[in-house]
């Protein structure tokens, strides 16, 4: 606790170390007025992008796909795009506040994220080794059980006639999943863990969830490196497609951050949400094609239903980047759906966060 507090004192956002709640709220209002982009121009640009996306959706045509499913995807995409643009227009002032705060506090965010990462393993003999141990043991356990004991790899991953080494297929799914699980768990509890900053200091509490997300990213970078090494060992040398790992990692960070603003705000008032998320993660691991191939599902409707899970896009993307050699724009509808969903969740999350933030200190 002291480490974070000292870092904040060194790089204070407002140059103050204390203040009443009324001063805090006034400071937040003044903070968001600085260097603000013209509202009408921002809304016009957002709607322009939304209309452009809708036009691309309507004009896109895949003659090999089921046309009924294609029309459903087009309609759903246009509706989601219109919904997101409408929410952005109505609640513009509330939605843009947090992105502005994050940008203006980027130096403080980086310092606090590094300090949070170091603090997590301070005092233990093995330190950061513990952060690596559980994921490695989990990968080895699943690999031994499914690949060596049951030898079920063909059924799980060779639905399209191509069977990469199962350990590589498994790691490409588990690496993004481990990051998502760790980041959403830590991000959800950010306000609760740093309650002393919420209550006692003039502090832009909107930076707390992203601090946790960035701290979890350090370990993720290490595991991405291990994943690439394993791929090379099996003969999958890096290609131009491998660069997409950066794109899919950015997708994952934005998606987790969008969810974290919503869950971190709600868990302050509903502590049971932490347990709900824990159970949801257990279910989500099996609902996401990490150990199995979504192509093995018997019907297109079931495949479409599972693809509503945004993590399917990311997990499949990691595999496309490493051994399937596919560009993300080849999955047009999946990419469009993912970003519309993520932006919508970010808008909703920031709205809820802004609506409840004045009550955080009282509850905590």
Task: Describe the residue ranges of each PLM region.
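Hydrophobic transmembrane alpha-helices and immediately adjacent juxtamembrane helices
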Residues: 5-11, 19-364
């Amino acid at each position: 606790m002291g480490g974070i507090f000292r870092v904040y004192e060194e790089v204070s956002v407002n140059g103050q170390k204390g203040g009443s709640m009324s001063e805090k709220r006034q400071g937040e209002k003044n903070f968001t007025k600085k260097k603000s982009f013209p509202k009408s121009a921002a809304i016009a640009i957002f709607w322009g992008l939304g209309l452009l996306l809708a036009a691309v959706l309507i004009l896109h045509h895949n003659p090999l796909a089921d046309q009924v499913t294609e029309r459903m995807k087009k309609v759903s995409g246009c509706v989601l795009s219109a919904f997101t643009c409408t929410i952005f227009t109505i609640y513009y002032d509330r939605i843009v506040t947090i992105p502005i705060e994050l940008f203006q506090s980027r130096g403080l965010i980086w310092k606090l994220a590094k300090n949070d990462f170091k603090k997590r393993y301070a005092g233990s003999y093995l330190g950061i080794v513990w952060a690596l141990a559980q994921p490695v043991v989990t990968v080895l356990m699943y690999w031994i059980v499914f690949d060596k004991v049951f030898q079920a790899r063909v059924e799980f991953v060779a639905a399209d006639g191509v069977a990469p080494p199962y350990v590589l297929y498994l790691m490409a799914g588990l690496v993004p999943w481990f990051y998502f699980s760790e980041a959403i768990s830590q991000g959800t509890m950010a306000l609760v863990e740093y309650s002393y900053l919420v209550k006692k200091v003039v502090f832009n509490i909107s930076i707390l969830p992203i601090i946790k997300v960035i701290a979890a990213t350090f370990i993720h970078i290490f595991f991405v490196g291990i994943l690439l090494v394993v791929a090379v060992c099996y003969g999958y040398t890096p290609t131009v497609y491998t660069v997409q790992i950066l794109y899919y990692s950015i997708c994952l960070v934005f998606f987790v951050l969008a969810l974290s603003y919503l869950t971190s705000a709600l868990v302050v008032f509903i502590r049971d949400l932490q347990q709900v998320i824990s159970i949801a993660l257990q279910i989500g691991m099996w609902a996401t094609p990490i150990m199995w191939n979504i192509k093995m599902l018997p019907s297109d409707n079931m495949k479409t239903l599972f693809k509503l899970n945004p993590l399917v896009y990311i997990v499949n993307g990691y595999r496309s980047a490493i051994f399937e050699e596919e560009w993300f724009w080849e999955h047009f509808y999946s990419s469009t759906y993912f970003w519309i969903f993520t932006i919508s969740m970010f808008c909703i999350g920031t709205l809820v966060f802004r609506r409840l933030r004045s009550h955080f200190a009282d509850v905590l």
